[in-house]
UniProtKB/Swiss-Prot annotation:
Principal localisation: nucleus
GO biological process, one term: cell differentiation
Extent of Low complexity compositional bias: 203-220
SUPFAM superfamilies xrefs: Winged helix' DNA-binding domain (SSF46785)
Xref: PROSITE patterns: FORK_HEAD_1, FORK_HEAD_2, FORK_HEAD_3
Biased composition (Pro residues): 163-175, 185-202
Entry protein name: Forkhead box protein B2
Organism: Homo sapiens (Human)
Gene name in the database record: FOXB2
Segment forming the signal sequence: none
Function: Transcription factor.
Region (Disordered): 118-220, 413-432
Alphabetical keyword list: DNA-binding, Nucleus, Transcription, Transcription regulation
DNA-binding region, residues: 13-107
Amino acid sequence: MPRPGKSSYSDQKPPYSYISLTAMAIQHSAEKMLPLSDIYKFIMERFPYYREHTQRWQNSLRHNLSFNDCFIKIPRRPDQPGKGSFWALHPDCGDMFENGSFLRRRKRFKVLRADHTHLHAGSTKSAPGAGPGGHLHPHHHHHPHHHHHHHAAAHHHHHHHPPQPPPPPPPPPPHMVHYFHQQPPTAPQPPPHLPSQPPQQPPQQSQPQQPSHPGKMQEAAAVAAAAAAAAAAAVGSVGRLSQFPPYGLGSAAAAAAAAAASTSGFKHPFAIENIIGRDYKGVLQAGGLPLASVMHHLGYPVPGQLGNVVSSVWPHVGVMDSVAAAAAAAAAAGVPVGPEYGAFGVPVKSLCHSASQSLPAMPVPIKPTPALPPVSALQPGLTVPAASQQPPAPSTVCSAAAASPVASLLEPTAPTSAESKGGSLHSVLVHS
């Protein structure tokens, strides 16, 4: 016996994952964030399957919230009543679902924590590099409490002589590269010359060494200027979206991808430029069929102001340049050029259609129609009943119609016989 309610599928498990159900609830809310209790309520109101065994699936959903990076936890403000934090979707997980369908998920969204750990590791490494006592100064200040005073003084003297050279700057984050590139690195240039000096040498003696390498400094300045120009172009074209590294890339790869995106003008794959832009641009560029040439070969007149319009709409496609060059070459060779001439100066309109016709120059086959007699030949036959004021005998009409119905229309003898018969009848009536 089938289970009751089987036909309606109301008690069946919906084909959505816990991530999809949670995303539905968050997207449906006005503030785009919900506490855990409201997420449970949303699911149970819309899917009767989850009204039973609530503890089981609620535990699973709570684990999905905690272990998936696509959900972020927002603490509750003091002025908001209730308890518990809010849950919202990560700002970068917009393409997590394929074509916006909650049934299919492209891939599991992951926040790139490798970048953050790499940056923290770089900062911890750069701090001791800036001064061997960078993080050890607080401990060495406590050394007099644990060691002898002369031992602490020796350590203090050892750690304060090397920090005379200016420290190198820490590596910037990947999403702040273009901001640092806008300023030419004038300060970090002296450190490469300073390690070659003895520790006791004052930093003022490093200044005469700078003019000894003018080529390297000019090259560094040129590289910095090029990087600043590229960064300015990236900020102008991409905007604030270039601050975020692309999904699935490391710090170095993110910087390279951001630079490539700024130079190639990458659009989102859904943008209209990626859908139809590549098609018509490829036809015009690779196919070698400019607009004026197509109109010319179809027989349409090409106005003179078309060159300005096309040049303003498609400045990267030499539309009118090729037409002007071809027209100049044809005029120099003595070949007539114009809308009414085809290839090699052959007139097209005079061969195919009249000059008054504005259709494209294409030969159209015409089917032959049967020749009809002139209208004047049919008029006497039609006026016979009116002149006689009396219809002819039925036997005469039937015999004439049965004899040859088509011949009475096409042959010129049919109206003559009808006229003669009508004349004889008229004479008989007059004489009687």
